[in-house]
Amino acid sequence: MDELGPAELARGRTALKRRQITDAALALFLRNGYDKTSMDQIAADAGVSKQTVYKQFADKETLFEEIARGVTGKSDHILDELTAIAQTPVSTGDDLRKTLQRLARRYLDAVMEQPVLSLRRLIIAEADQFPELASHYYQQGPQRGLDLIESALRRWSEQGLLAAPDLRLAASQFAYLVLGSSQDHALFQSGQTPRPAERTRIAKAAASMFLAAYGR
């Protein structure tokens, strides 16, 4: 294997420092909020000089936006898992109930992850200052989740397993049955999320209530 040249080594060191800075900044933003986090703190926690931070990022706003966009971009793997569940072959009402339960449970688990809750809390707190970033977060997270559910409901409706006149509304209702109370509680009471058995109970109840309204 060829040894890395000076240019490649320099790029590697730069990438490492950039990662150190973004990791430290994310932890500080989540813990202290945007306004109470300084570039001095970020540099100290990252183990780099303040000049290095400013060499990578023009200002705190730029750093915050890049971090938030990067974190929301990591939602792809969760959506891939939800899509795989939603695309499970369904031919009977019982199949549909089981699939909805699995979809509800994975959806709940994803949103109840502490980093997800912390970032959502932070984005909401800074939405007035960063409206475009808040919009991006919504589009990449909650909206894509609703799009996925709506697509699955449409397919099941076409199979004759559901009768929902407004699929977007039905998707929103399913999402709230799954997330509503638990998410509200977790956002206001940090660290308090449903235990596994309770999550299973919520998922089953959400599927049952949804099918009671729209199942054929």
Model-predicted segments: where are they?
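C-terminal peripheral helix-coil segments that are non-catalytic and often amphipathic
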Residues: 1-8, 102, 143, 147, ...
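N-terminal intrinsically disordered/low-complexity leader segments
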Residues: 1-16, 79-88
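Generic hydrophobic, amphipathic alpha-helix propensity
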Residues: 17-25, 42, 67, 71, ...
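Helix-turn-helix
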Residues: 20, 28-67
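Short hydrophobic clusters on alpha-helical segments that form packing/core surfaces
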Residues: 21-29, 107, 210
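Conserved hydrophobic residue
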Residues: 34-35, 133, 162
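Hydrophobic alpha-helical connector segments
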Residues: 66, 79-113, 167-174
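Amphipathic alpha-helical packing segments from all-alpha helical-bundle domains
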Residues: 98, 109-118, 122-124, 131-158, ...
